[in-house]
Regions:
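DNA major-groove recognition helix of helix-turn-helix/homeodomain DNA-binding modules
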Residues: 50-66
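A short, Lys/Arg-rich alpha-helix, primarily the initiator
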Residues: 1-22
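Residue-level signal for the short linker/turn that defines the boundary of a DNA-recognition helix
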Residues: 21-22, 47-50
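Short, charged recognition helix plus adjacent turn
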Residues: 67-84
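Recognition helix of helix-turn-helix/homeodomain-like DNA-binding domains
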Residues: 32-47
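Short alpha-helical "recognition helix" segments of helix-turn-helix
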Residues: 27-28
Length: 84
């Protein structure tokens, strides 16, 4: 089964950072990385859960909520398996 990327986590992080008026440099400093790494994060559809957790804590915003909502929608849309 092919995995669908309905949620683009990198774009969500970039949008939230902008809404909060925080800079890429600020997030890079908080993560302990170079700002080019943050720009690379913005380009990713998905992230390692540990990195997403760190970013969620740093930015005080639970990015997992978006994934949970989308996952539940996909579960609900999936047909029930046929009983034997």
């Amino acid at each position: 089964m092919q995995q669908q990327h309905r949620i683009h986590v990198g774009k969500l992080i970039r949008e939230r950072l902008k809404e909060e008026g925080k800079s890429v440099v600020w997030l890079a400093q908080e993560l302990g990385c170079h700002r080019t790494n943050v720009y690379n994060i913005f380009e990713k559809n998905s992230l390692d859960t540990n990195i997403l957790r760190r970013i969620s804590i740093i930015m005080r915003h639970n990015f997992f909520d978006y994934l949970q909502e989308d996952t539940q929608k996909q579960i609900d849309a999936r047909p029930s398996p046929a009983l034997p």
